[in-house]
A protein has these predicted regions:
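Catalytic-site microenvironment of enzymes
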Residues: 63-65, 109
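Glycine-rich nucleotide cofactor-binding entry segment
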Residues: 103
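N-terminal intrinsically disordered, low-complexity tails enriched in polar/charged
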Residues: 4, 25-38
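Gram-negative bacterial Sec-dependent N-terminal signal peptides
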Residues: 1-26
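Extracellular beta-strand/loop-rich repeat segments of large surface/secreted proteins
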Residues: 225, 247, 254-382
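Extracellular beta-strand/beta-solenoid scaffold signature
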Residues: 25-28, 40-53, 70-90, 106-142, ...
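All-beta strand scaffolds that present successive hydrophobic residues in beta-strands
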Residues: 31-37, 58-63, 94-100, 135-137, ...
């Protein structure tokens, strides 16, 4: 490929050659239609590695963008973590990429610790701290990618925090690596929003708006491996103000579209969801969702106290989908493979959906899914 090059090179210490393997180092990228002449930003270091770090800037890449990052997320000698991230935009930055984005994120020793802050230090795309100085929508942080997006990340795929919004119109391929202790996600929001496989800008989402979104004339292929998280950052350093909701909208509308992972909604888990934060999943035309939690469960402050006081906490007790939109006919139904021990909870079901019960603990007395408001048709298959 003929790249325009903007290379930031660091030294990779010789000691890295002793590492038994490098997370993400040998990943193969599909979606070869990614643009032929993107600008390339490449960083390789023995510690912190961030390819793009921008504050309150307006950036436009008309010919596409390719990010390559190789860093070390955790110094085992000094017991110190480092940020290893592809795109890190904050404080009202507006980033628009045309003709496609590719992010390759490798990490010799990721920060795989049971730390509620671990997911902040490793993302393909991180957008945060919108409206840091002035509470006005024009100071939101925004990332919009038109065309193919391919993210292969050690850590999160995409993360949108306070007053920050990411829209990937597609096609989209996101692959993450499961950790043993740290919780990481294909998509994660904390008082921000993310749209995957949709042209509707993420800063327009509300608790009910995605349900009435006009149907696209043609769906893009979406392939996602990793959990999604709607988290309530009401603790620790820089807690969110709680002015509005957190939303993920993901459209799987082609036969080759697939999501493997589960959905954590801390607002729904705790029973305190004033802005109806959650996940809207469109699943039709025989697209598939393999529901199973991947990797480590989340550790966070306040869970035990809330559980003791109310009987509800923040931890994952099953995938929670705010709105599930199935096919328009039985022939165009979406398909769920329920492979997790915990049940799926759907607030609102629209359209036709089939669910195949593959739970390892399945019994005839427990259902693989619970639908609170059924406005469609659900078929359960064994």
């Amino acid at each position: 490929m003929n790249y325009k090059r903007n290379v930031l090179a660091g030294l990779v210490m010789a000691c890295l050659s002793t590492v038994p393997f490098v997370y993400g180092a040998s990943a193969e990228v599909g979606f070869q239609q990614v643009v032929t002449q993107p600008e390339l930003i490449e960083v390789s270091t023995a510690g912190r590695a961030v390819a793009m770090r921008k504050y309150h800037e307006v950036l436009n890449y008309p010919e596409g963008l390719h990010i390559k990052v190789n860093g070390v997320g955790y110094d085992m000698v000094q017991q110190k973590h480092h940020n290893v991230t592809g795109i890190y935009v904050l404080d009202g930055t507006k980033l628009t990429v045309h003709k496609g984005l590719q992010v390759d994120l490798s990490n010799a020793h990721p920060y795989d610790q049971a730390d509620e802050m671990a997911h902040y230090y490793m993302s393909g795309i991180y957008a945060g701290f919108g409206r840091k100085q002035i509470d006005d929508p024009k100071y939101d942080t925004q990332v919009v990618v038109h065309g193919p997006t391919v993210i292969q990340a050690v850590g999160n795929g995409v993360q949108a925090n306070k007053d920050s919004y990411i829209t990937l119109d597609g096609p989209v391929k996101i692959e993450t690596v499961p950790f043993e202790q740290a919780d990481v996600y294909a998509a994660i929001v904390e008082e921000g929003s993310i749209g995957i496989g949709t042209s509707r800008l993420a800063d327009t989402y509300t608790g009910t708006a995605p349900v009435s979104t006009p149907k696209p004339s043609q769906y893009a292929t979406v392939q996602v491996t990793g959990n999604v998280g709607v988290l309530n950052k009401n603790y620790g350093l820089n807690p969110n103000p709680g002015r509005h909701g957190s939303y993920i909208v993901m459209n799987l509308g082609t036969k080759d579209s697939v999501w493997t992972g589960a959905a954590l909604n801390e607002f729904a888990e705790s029973g305190n969801n004033p802005h109806q934060s959650g996940v809207t999943l469109e699943l039709k035309n025989q697209a598939t969702w393999h529901n199973r939690w991947i990797g480590a469960k989340r550790h966070r402050s306040g869970h035990e106290e809330l559980l003791l006081a109310t009987g509800k906490g923040y931890t994952f007790t099953g995938s929670h989908i705010q709105t599930l939109i199935g096919g328009d006919t039985p022939e165009t139904a979406g398909i769920i493979y329920q492979e997790d021990t915990e049940p799926i909870v759907v607030d609102v079901l629209q359209g036709y959906v089939k669910i195949v019960d593959r739970r390892p603990n399945a019994t005839n007395t427990t259902a693989p899914i619970r639908v609170i408001s059924n406005r469609g048709q659900l078929t359960i298959l064994k």
